Amino acid sequence: MRQFIRKARYYETDQMGIIHHSNYIRWMEEARIDMLNQLGYPYRRFEELGYISPVLHVECEYKKSVKFDDEVKIVVSLKEFGRVKFTLRYDIYNMSEGGELSAYGTTTHCFLKKDGRPVLIDKEMKEFAETMKTLSMEKENQ
């Protein structure tokens, strides 16, 4: 899979001249959307199938600040995959600082039908479940 790389923008900085903590969560979302697009599952496809995918939980641990114009690489991996929900891990590396780990975090998601009922991923979204399990196996083989 293609790596997700982006530059830190000036408007993302705070008064101290570093990237505001809330932007790391946005970057994680950008990387997640990019990963799903690469796997052939853009959000629009889920919506066309009648599913939504809310974020159930998000957390981020900050290790070292990122500054304006730094280039970051975000590596997304599958941490857990269950029948109803799955968790992704994000490792955010500052490539402008020699690839140093700047932050890491997780997001947990589920799928709901438009009427709000939960989806059993392994039964109702078998193709997606298999794709995600393949992603997990690729990580184990690295």
List the predicted regions and their residue ranges.
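Catalytic strand-loop segment that frames the active site of acyl-thioester-processing enzymes
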Residues: 1-30, 34-35
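HotDog/MaoC-like acyl-thioester-processing domains
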Residues: 2-4, 37, 67-68, 79-142
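Short aromatic/hydrophobic contact patches that present stacked aromatics
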Residues: 7, 59, 108
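Anionic, Ser/Thr-rich low-complexity intrinsically disordered regions
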Residues: 12, 16-21, 29, 59, ...
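Hydrophobic beta-strand-centered segment that forms part of the acyl-chain substrate-binding groove
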Residues: 35-86, 100, 104
